[in-house]
Amino acid sequence: MSSNSKLLIDIQTASPAIEAALKKIASSALIKKWIKAATPLSGLLTLRFVNSTEGKKLNAAFRKKHYATNVLTFPYEHSKSALSADIIFCLPVIRKEAKEQGKTVKAHLAHLIVHGCLHAQGFDHEHEKETKKMEKLEVALLKKLGFTDPYLTTQ
């Protein structure tokens, strides 16, 4: 996938603490680079980085799951040339998972940004065939960005 300069990207943080934590992991420019590598589409993409409380509330409201999850994608529309979506990232969950999986937080966040962008474009992992297709694409995109296979146990 190639980058598209017509993609408007809005990066939001839920609090000054989340903003400070995010800046220690990746700059806005780097996050935008990861996004543009994951989608050739134009449109509007909003990324919101939240704490566990907000992550849990959103997951409960929209998925009826009463825990904070790493990433939630809300695609509003997409076509072959444009998309509109909000993607929510829960930084405490991402940090915890990275540690448990023996990955850097930066590598795990890059993976989840690519993952969320693919969801925004209509990719899913509800069935094995879809999962394999999505994972293969994630691995290829992350490799181009300089990251190893996120499905390996250590990085």
UniProtKB/Swiss-Prot annotation:
Top-level taxon in the UniProt lineage: Bacteria
Binding site for Zn(2+): H115, H119, H125
Cofactor(s) the record lists: Zn(2+)
InterPro entries: MetalPrtase_cat_dom_sf_prd, YbeY, YbeY_CS
GO cellular component: cytoplasm
Ranges that cross the membrane: none
A Gene Ontology molecular function term of the record: RNA endonuclease activity
Localization per record: Cytoplasm
PROSITE patterns registered for this protein in UniProt: UPF0054
Keyword tags: Cytoplasm, Endonuclease, Hydrolase, Metal-binding, Nuclease, Ribosome biogenesis, rRNA processing, Zinc
GO biological processes: rRNA processing
E.C. numbers: 3.1.-.-
Cofactor note: Binds 1 zinc ion.
Role this protein plays: Single strand-specific metallo-endoribonuclease involved in late-stage 70S ribosome quality control and in maturation of the 3' terminus of the 16S rRNA.
HAMAP family: Endoribonucl_YbeY
NCBIfam families recorded: rRNA maturation RNase YbeY
Family: Belongs to the endoribonuclease YbeY family.
Protein's UniProt name: Endoribonuclease YbeY
Gene for this chain: ybeY
